[in-house]
């Protein structure tokens, strides 16, 4: 499994700095290498809005890291233009942080170590590491309506709308199956469950739909081939 203290240096000067500020649930959302949204919104005053910053369109959040290798911009990007700019509520951002930190980082690490890198390569410094490409993450209600207008059939109760799901791009069937195996192994080794793991295909294009909720996960596994 991935030793997260090893890549903590990408965001904090030392592991001890991680304990300096626990102001709110956004301590893990990095505005820059050494500053988090939690640090810059902390306050001793109790208010109904919890001094929470508004989350804007994805293009402005490419530098906001949900985890070392995934940004808020990546997980809110969409080709549909809407009035809300596919802006996630704060609860959805928290779910995205959990998804990236507990699942996607592990998947990225294990796939590269098992199938891409040589034994002598260092995952944290090698230029041969393959990125994990997200086709879609959070989906707002307005984006869902746009998808329906386009002739698609998105679910109104989809995990995407809570920030609990991602669609992961796959180079083909073999890579998709390897991703599935790794995610199942992560679940078994960590003794934590996911909600949905679907290998999907449309024509010759493959992707993996993966969802993990804060609770009430159903461990649904399926193949949806069209």
Regions found by a protein language model. Give the residues of each.
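Generic secondary-structure microfeatures
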Residues: 111, 136-138, 151, 170-172
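Charged, often glycine-rich, active-site loop that binds/positions anionic groups
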Residues: 141-158
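A structural signal for short, well-ordered beta-strand segments and their strand-loop junctions
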Residues: 116-119, 129-135, 198-199, 209-211
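Catalytic cores and adjacent binding grooves of peptidoglycan-active enzymes
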Residues: 157-166, 170-226
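Polar/charged alpha-helical tracts
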Residues: 6, 10, 112, 127, ...
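Extracytoplasmic cell-surface/polysaccharide-interacting catalytic and binding patches
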Residues: 1-128, 214, 219-226
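Acidic helix-start/capping segments at beta-turn-to-alpha-helix junctions
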Residues: 125-145
């Amino acid at each position: 499994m991935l030793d997260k203290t090893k890549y903590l240096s990408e965001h904090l000067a030392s592991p001890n700095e991680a304990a300096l500020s626990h102001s709110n649930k956004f301590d893990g959302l990095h505005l820059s290498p050494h500053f988090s949204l939690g640090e810059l919104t902390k306050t001793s005053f109790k208010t109904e809005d919890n001094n929470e910053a508004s989350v804007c369109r994805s293009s402005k959040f490419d530098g906001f890291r949900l985890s070392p290798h995934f940004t808020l911009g990546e997980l809110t990007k969409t080709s549909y233009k809407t009035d809300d700019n596919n802006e996630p509520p704060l609860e959805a951002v928290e779910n995205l942080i959990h998804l990236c930190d507990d699942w996607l980082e592990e998947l990225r690490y294990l796939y590269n170590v098992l199938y891409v890198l040589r034994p002598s390569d260092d995952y944290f410094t090698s230029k041969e590491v393959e990125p994990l490409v997200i086709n879609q993450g959070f989906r707002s209600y307005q984006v869902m309506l746009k998808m329906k207008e386009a002739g698609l059939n998105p679910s109104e109760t989809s995990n995407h709308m809570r920030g609990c799901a991602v669609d992961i791009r796959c180079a083909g069937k073999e890579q998709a199956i390897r991703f599935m195996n790794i995610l199942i192994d992560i679940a078994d080794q960590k003794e934590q469950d996911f909600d949905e793991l679907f290998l999907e295909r449309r024509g010759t294009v493959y992707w993996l739909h993966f969802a993990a909720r804060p609770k009430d996960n159903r461990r649904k596994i399926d193949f949806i081939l069209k």
